[in-house]
């Protein structure tokens, strides 16, 4: 492998592509399978791709709704009209996680139908909501949905397995285009592996098109993250061995985040670094710190120097956030 990752191979290419409007067009409402209807949230943008996907699941009069989008009029008007004309009732409203582009439509749903107030389910629920536990089953005609705890993108993140299709509603853990972000990278990686172990064939993401080869997409996500860890650790290790003297003296040869970007990827536009790279790479550095592979020199966060730990140090040094 070369010492640097080519610009075109990394996730920010799709990040920028999405901002430029090159994503495939998705219908506002579409039957993506016999038992799944996707309704867009009406909130397209660089962070939401074509908008938040919400899903009606089931084949009978009673259905399950997964996520409620951002709370824009376009979504509540669209789903209310569809439910009314098709004479469909909601038995459960399942929320993948707490982020506003997934929970924002809850008040509108309740305002349209007050009986839904006691049908809202979320892991670590807000006041008035019901809890979701790992393995919990939600059933309606044509759909048996099992809750899967998958934290990392957020602390409360849930995926939902549709047993009739061997399909997984992936929430924000895996997107239809590009790569997601993680609040806790270590737990996120564990969740990706847990998702892969389920053996689901297809994925219904919270943003982007249906994933027709979910095992392949999950492998791509895992390899992408692990590859970045290896590249960053390699860059820090190469830099460390150039130092001489005691350990304290070698710490002076650490790299700042911008220097790591330069070492791994070469020169990039500052906008790409700040908006698409820095948050993700900092997550990698903290994970490597927690894994006792990397340490850092305390100080100004913007100028903080990171360094690879030698093997003998890894059993003695614990990284701590500061």
UniProtKB/Swiss-Prot annotation:
Entry-linked Pfam families: Lactamase_B
Top-rank lineage group of the source organism: Eukaryota
GO biological process: antibiotic catabolic process; secondary metabolite biosynthetic process
Enzyme class name: hydrolase
Key words of the record: Hydrolase, Metal-binding, Zinc
Role summary: Lactamase-like protein; part of the gene cluster that mediates the biosynthesis of neosartoricin B, a prenylated anthracenone that probably exhibits T-cell antiproliferative activity, suggestive of a physiological role as an immunosuppressive agent. The non-reducing polyketide synthase nscA probably synthesizes and cyclizes the decaketide backbone. The hydrolase nscB then mediates the product release through hydrolysis followed by spontaneous decarboxylation. The prenyltransferase nscD catalyzes the addition of the dimethylallyl group to the aromatic C5.
Protein name (record): Lactamase-like protein nscB
Gene field: nscB
